[in-house]
Swiss-Prot record:
The modification N6-methyllysine is found at residues 135, 273, 332. It is an enzyme of class 3 (hydrolase). This is Beta-galactosidase. The active site is at 206 (proton donor), 387 (nucleophile). GO terms for biological process: carbohydrate metabolic process. Keywords: Glycosidase, Hydrolase, Methylation. InterPro entries: Beta-galactosidase, Glyco_hydro_1, Glyco_hydro_1_AS, Glyco_hydro_1_N_CS, Glycoside_hydrolase_SF. Belongs to the glycosyl hydrolase 1 family. Pfam families: Glyco_hydro_1. GO terms for molecular function: beta-galactosidase activity; beta-glucosidase activity. It catalyses: Hydrolysis of terminal non-reducing beta-D-galactose residues in beta-D-galactosides.
Amino acid sequence: MYSFPKNFRFGWSQAGFQSEMGTPGSEDPNTDWYKWVHDPENISAGLVSGDLPENGPGYWGNYKTFHDNAQKMGLKIARLNVEWSRIFPNQLPKPQNFDDSKQDVTEVEINQNELRRLDEHANKDALNHYREIFKDLKSRGIYFILNMYHWPLPLWLHDPIRVRRGDLSGPTGWLSTRTVYEFARFSAYIAWKFDDLVDEYSTMNEPNVVGGLGYVGVKSGFPPGYLSFELSRKAMYNIIQAHARAYDGIKSVSKKPIGIIYANSSFQPLTEKDVEAVEMAEYDNRWAFFDAIIRGEIMRGSEKVVRDDLRGRLDWIGVNYYTRTVVKKTEKGYTSLGGYGHGCERNSVSLAGLPTSDFGWEFFPEGLYDVLTKYWNRYHLYMYVTENGIADDADYQRPYYLVSHVYQVHRAINSGADVRGYLHWSLADNYEWASGFSMRFGLLKVDYGTKRLYWRPSALVYREIATNGGITDEIEHLNTVPPIRPLRH
């Protein structure tokens, strides 16, 4: 048996926009994402699926059923978020000392008077309902990580359709320092309201996806779908500042640890000659971001500067991992290659002969070990695996995927990395952003018509892991690449 440390926790992660809607009264129409997926032009262009989040799994109304299933599975940790737009659906008065002419936001004033002013504008019904959800979670002995931001912005801060059409007069989301100020205030306010129920905080989930797919990978179907490398860099600059100011804001009302959750790929060289390409890819896609919020090092234009107001703004790292990226060195640097990682055909095999998921993502568990150990060796901050899972409606690969990736976490811990939990993505099927309901990541299968939850076989495998604190001898045989099925005709 592969046993984990006694204090290690197995659990799950989920997001509000993807899971909450689906029961009467659960709709949240006041976000950029809601407007984006309902936009007729986006739907007709195939940028989004046409599936609508208000038909989702219904966690807002049925959270106790979700928690019942998690408890039966033996899960002991959960990462959830508060939807910003539910708490502040309407535009707030501008923050004190706000100056939109300044590129650098080095401080956002947070005090008791400011928090009380925010409280006057907050949606009390939403606050009370979130408290009911979190209290129910805690009553079951589940350790709780509260994440502040999992992609949707309030419409009063970001109108993605206007930006997509080239209107940058506002509201422009992460292109504006106003969003930096507001996120700091929101994060401090949420910590002020819920600190008695929270064990640890995360400021954001996968900020690199927001800054990348919204402005560079515009065919991904992510808002605002405005192609501009310059604006992508501007958005990431503001996101880094927003994390640091939110960290300060939360610390002003709480002593709990604060992390950030990041989308990771394991960069692998095509040949031995491409090791330098891996180093460049890791810096561009990972270390540049974390060097900013840990060491204070950030690029301003073409110049690297050190900002003390960014330094040391992180207590732990949330590692999201699904697959790898194979890179090759070029004259100008490096390039990522199709046929591996995220760039494969769906339900097929990669160029390496490895099976791929319903999403076309390659089965590559050893990449999780690579990511965890490299984070540990560079920063020595403790970690959680905050997302790991597979789109697999048939649940054929998921049992293998689950055991193989949990094993790689065990390897990383044995190599000295401080990893304190594994949170699977996800407990139940949900709304997979631009792909709608077609991509099913759940241990529990959702019947979207009845909102009933059904246990997939992989849920039984995860229960075996969670209740025994590791990979037992009975399921160790799943620590391998799943046998590849014949191609369907």
